């Protein structure tokens, strides 16, 4: 029938337009809105990017001091970014407590957003106010075939993991286990129009049998296997991006040059570098 013929001729762009029908700006628009910073060579742009799911702890405090000092020593910029996409765990007065702590210890950022006031030219500095930006970048990934809708249910994913564990295989959504990776555009469009819930996954091109070297400013050269996990970059319930995706877009557009964070994040480097083609890598 006519509907089937129309769906059969659909492209990745049609799929992207179906998922994001109301975006008014493109990736190119945002690249122009956030130009390179006018700083001297060697100036460090650093950030403190807490989630308002708790109060500042010693780890936060230590990384804040390092980021603050590094930016001041190089005549750079230190900014505060509120990563508030985990609304279910958000604590009402967390942002106020963070700002009070920064002010008390003379660690106030050069750029920030607080109580409706934006200080700086690279805001908004609150992630929940940047959703359309993330959507524009996810839409572009879908258009070029580097992201796709995944319709796997929680039960399906639990069964997958259980099966992998029983067979002592590496767990995750990758390769032949990435059930929705190669479904046709036509099928994806039909299932979305039928109201089937979905997330958006990044389509990785990594090979875990291959290695790459990452240059860490503290630990030096570190070798990792490439990432082949098709990681979720947009959730299904509220169309919010995941942390892994949102912070990369932000660091790119805000022109962050150095990231100081805990060692527990080292294992995420392969994933972040596989996503980094949307931006330029920052230094860690």
Where are each of the predicted segments found?
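Active-site cores that bind ATP or allylic diphosphates and position pyrophosphate for catalysis
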Residues: 140-279, 283
